Design a protein with these regions (language model features):
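N-terminal "first-domain core" detector
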Residues: 1-63
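Intrinsically disordered, low-complexity regions
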Residues: 9-12, 89-97, 107-111, 208-213
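N-terminal, helix-rich and Lys/Arg-enriched segments in bacterial and organellar proteins
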Residues: 19-32, 62, 72-79, 109-116, ...
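Compact, well-ordered interaction domains used in eukaryotic information-processing assemblies
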Residues: 37-44, 54-100
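Short, low-complexity cationic-aromatic patches
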Residues: 42-47, 68-72, 119-123, 149-158
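Beta-strand-rich binding-surface signature
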Residues: 50, 67, 127-129
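Short, solvent-exposed interaction modules
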Residues: 80-84, 88, 97-151
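Mixed-charge, glycine-accented linear interaction segment located at domain edges/termini
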Residues: 133-217
Length: 217
């Protein structure tokens, strides 16, 4: 860990030196057993299930500490893209923004991850950069107030995201198994029962009760 930081038992992965630190922490939440209108009913995550990324700049006084929450699907997306780009000379630029205006706040946070494998016609030792910027929105324009950036090598960023995804897989198996067993499978069993009942009735020969009898006298 970096200086002036306390151990966090929810910490999944971290990379640090004397200047900066990047860490990932478990802010995951299991699915709501009663369902969530904003998520697929069979999703293994609650609406606000997240991986919290932390960036700290120790060189400033006081140190700058910024965080950004990523959806598990965003973590997996980045993991896949990083794996495909490593050992190539391709550039990469991905970002996501959170606007808190709907909460009556003009705060804006921006997470960005870039790759620039060549600098000044030479292979970069640390081609990746992960940054978090925090600021405000004024008249539709973003005004940055704080920023922390961490440079990483191909190996460092791969190990970082591999550790996160490995943890994510175990977490989903741990919480997903009882959810599937206690919620999804009973629902499917009831659905099968209903389908079988309809099929059984459709296969039965008609009886006199199925016909209307008219008296023409």
């Amino acid at each position: 860990m970096g200086k002036n930081t306390k151990p966090d038992v929810s910490q999944i992965a971290f990379i640090t030196n004397q200047k900066t630190l990047i860490a990932a922490c478990d802010y995951l939440q299991p699915p709501d057993l009663n369902g969530d209108p904003d998520k697929c009913p069979a999703s293994l995550h609650a609406r606000y299930s997240r991986i919290k990324l932390i960036l700290t700049d120790f060189e400033r006084n006081p140190s700058v500490f910024l965080t950004y929450n990523l959806d598990p699907s965003e973590i997996r997306l980045l993991h896949e893209k990083i794996g495909m780009l490593t050992m190539t000379e391709r550039n990469f630029d991905w970002s996501t923004t959170k606007d808190f205006s709907s909460f009556g706040n003009n705060r804006v946070e921006v997470f960005r991850i870039t790759r620039m494998p060549m600098r000044n016609n030479q292979k970069a030792k640390y081609p990746w950069a992960i940054s978090i910027r925090a600021g405000t929105s004024e008249n539709g324009k973003f005004k940055a107030e704080q920023e922390v950036r961490k440079f990483l090598s191909d190996d460092e960023i791969q190990k970082f995201f591999i550790d996160i995804v490995a943890y994510l897989n175990v977490w989903e198996m741990t919480h997903g198994a009882p959810f599937i067993r206690n919620v999804i499978e009973p629902y499917k069993a009831e659905r099968r029962k209903g389908i079988q009942e309809k099929s059984r009735k459709a296969a039965e020969p008609p009886t006199s009760d199925d016909f209307e009898i008219y008296d023409f006298d």
